[in-house]
């Protein structure tokens, strides 16, 4: 995304600026004050993107192959994998183009590069928005399955889930086009930040509510079988730990990127903020890491999906 302070604009590569040496150290801002700058090696960035790409392709292939997985829940998981695939793929594509331009292996007009840059940015932004939306959709789906278990199949029908999925993709593409077109307006960046916070609050409220219901259910079973209280307490601790990990990973991987957007609006010239801007590639790397972790949390925990995945891998050999 063409954000102030982000060293990713393709047009900047036409100047043949040498790539920074990978390091973790102090860099100076425009006033000479020291800044902590973490430089991510291009090879590491591309390797993480490739891992995410392969992992999410396998999830999509497994769900597409097994008709038993063609349920609303797995449709949302499949779309999450597809959007994560696009997040990693678009970032890898832009990084590859930047490296080719810097190395002189790709020579083209500045207008063509700018058009390619805008196209990739729309793809990146829309896939990021889709990824966040489908994380929220999965949380809503699980909440309905727990609190409206008897009516779940009448509430969350496959056609209804397909309409929700189509609406998310269309809204994300349209929104990302507007965001990229008007990226220099503060209101646009603030909308993205508010959207992230809304998804974080939605997921936190729904998962905490589900954890509370699960603890009540476990407590009822404990009373029914006259077991000792520690069994229920242990369940609550495990559930709280799982919830903390789930929300913690989401916040740690996505939070720095949206903090960057917020700082672009409120303190673009501040010394501390300018130091944070130097680590933009780190924030993108964290998002790539999230696209690697998502299948582990939402997809690979399913025994049916793992079995299908083995079949897909065996068929490919």
Curated annotation (Swiss-Prot):
Disulfide-linked positions: none
Subcellular location field: Cell membrane
InterPro entries to which the protein is assigned, alphabetical: GPCR_Rhodpsn (IPR000276), GPCR_Rhodpsn_7TM (IPR017452), Melcrt_ACTH_rcpt (IPR001671), MSH_rcpt (IPR000761)
UniProt GO BP: adenylate cyclase-activating G protein-coupled receptor signaling pathway
Signal peptide coordinates: none
Alphabetical list of Pfam families matching this protein: 7tm_1
Positions glycosylated per UniProt: 29
Sequence ranges on the Cytoplasmic membrane side: 64-72, 141-163, 212-240, 301-317
TM region positions: 38-63, 73-93, 119-140, 164-183, 192-211, 241-266, 280-300
Superkingdom per UniProt: Eukaryota
Extracellular topological intervals: 1-37, 94-118, 184-191, 267-279
Function, as annotated: Receptor for MSH (alpha, beta and gamma) and ACTH. The activity of this receptor is mediated by G proteins which activate adenylate cyclase. Mediates melanogenesis, the production of eumelanin (black/brown) and phaeomelanin (red/yellow), via regulation of cAMP signaling in melanocytes.
Complexes and interactors: Interacts with MGRN1, but does not undergo MGRN1-mediated ubiquitination; this interaction competes with GNAS-binding and thus inhibits agonist-induced cAMP production. Interacts with OPN3; the interaction results in a decrease in MC1R-mediated cAMP signaling and ultimately a decrease in melanin production in melanocytes.
Family: Belongs to the G-protein coupled receptor 1 family.
Protein name: Melanocyte-stimulating hormone receptor
Native organism: Saimiri oerstedii (Central American squirrel monkey)
Gene name tied to this protein: MC1R
């Amino acid at each position: 995304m063409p954000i102030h302070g982000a060293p990713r604009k393709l047009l900047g590569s036409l100047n043949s600026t040498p790539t920074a040496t990978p390091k973790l150290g102090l860099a100076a801002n425009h006033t000479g004050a020291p800044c902590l700058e973490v430089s991510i090696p291009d090879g590491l960035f591309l390797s993480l993107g490739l891992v995410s790409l392969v992992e999410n392709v396998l999830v999509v292939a497994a769900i597409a192959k097994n008709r038993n997985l063609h349920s609303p829940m797995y449709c949302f998981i499949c779309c999450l994998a597809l959007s994560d695939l696009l997040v990693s793929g678009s970032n890898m594509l832009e990084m590859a183009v930047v490296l080719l331009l810097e190395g002189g292996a790709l020579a083209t007009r500045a207008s063509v590069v700018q058009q390619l840059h805008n196209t990739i940015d729309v793809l990146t932004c829309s896939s990021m928005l889709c990824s966040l939306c489908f994380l929220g959709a999965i949380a809503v789906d699980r909440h309905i399955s727990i609190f409206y278990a008897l009516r779940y199949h009448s509430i969350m029908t496959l056609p209804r889930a397909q309409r929700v999925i189509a609406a998310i993709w269309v809204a994300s593409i349209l929104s990302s086009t507007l965001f990229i077109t008007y990226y220099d307006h503060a209101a646009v960046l603030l909308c993205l930040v508010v959207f992230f916070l809304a998804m974080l609050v939605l997921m936190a409220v729904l998962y905490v509510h589900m954890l509370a219901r699960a603890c009540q259910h476990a407590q009822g079973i404990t009373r029914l079988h006259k077991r000792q209280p520690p069994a229920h307490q242990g369940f609550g601790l495990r559930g709280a730990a799982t919830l903390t990990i789930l929300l913690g990973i989401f916040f740690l991987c996505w939070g720095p990127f949206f903090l960057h957007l917020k700082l672009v609006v409120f303190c673009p010239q501040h010394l501390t903020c300018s130091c944070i801007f130097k680590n933009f590639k780190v924030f993108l790397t964290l998002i790539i890491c999230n696209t690697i972790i998502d299948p582990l949390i939402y997809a690979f925990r399913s025994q049916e999906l793992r079995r299908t995945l083995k079949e897909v891998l065996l068929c490919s050999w």
